[in-house]
Amino acid sequence: FSWTKNVHLPEGKFYGSAIYASKVNLTPSTPIYNEDGTYASGYRENNGYNPILEAEVNDYYARTVRAMGTAKIAYNVWDNLKVSSVFTVDYSLTKDFFFQSPDGRDGATYQGRGRMQMTDRIRYTSQNNLTYSKTFGKHSVSAVTAFEVMKYDYEDLYAAKKTYGQDINTSLGNAADPIDADQKLQEDALMS
């Protein structure tokens, strides 16, 4: 069993992200803060994006819960005949959330924008064997019959909203206008 939470910046997703573009465009002499302590903006480099402001007012995180388990049972039917079965489960639930604050450049156009994506995956596998093995002096006879069953379920749920109120609660329920919502379901099964 594992549970993780990653807090991250939107690196690697958009070329125009403030953090990525800052690596390329801003110089060490570009001010991050104004003399009064507020965040500086309006400079020509990087279209006025301030990477420290964006990192502070925006919220990006991913949570993952994962559980895996295996059980095995074996039974000797007769002296030379054995039945065995192995059952495994692999389950994961991932929730990705990002919030672009109306105080930052990315969220200002939307008066704040939030997106959440939840992905639910579960895989079951069952391996079943019937084994016969007999030795006659210097000779042996063995036979195995087996089958495996696998089932995989996948569900992805996505929603995005915009127009957050003055009291910033980053929950999607606090935004007024839906942007998009989608759901994807997939089921696969295999027997061999």
Predicted features and spans:
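Surface-exposed loop/interface segments of Gram-negative outer-membrane beta-barrel transport/assembly proteins
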Residues: 1-66, 86-191
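Outer-membrane beta-barrel strand-turn architecture
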Residues: 75-81, 134-137
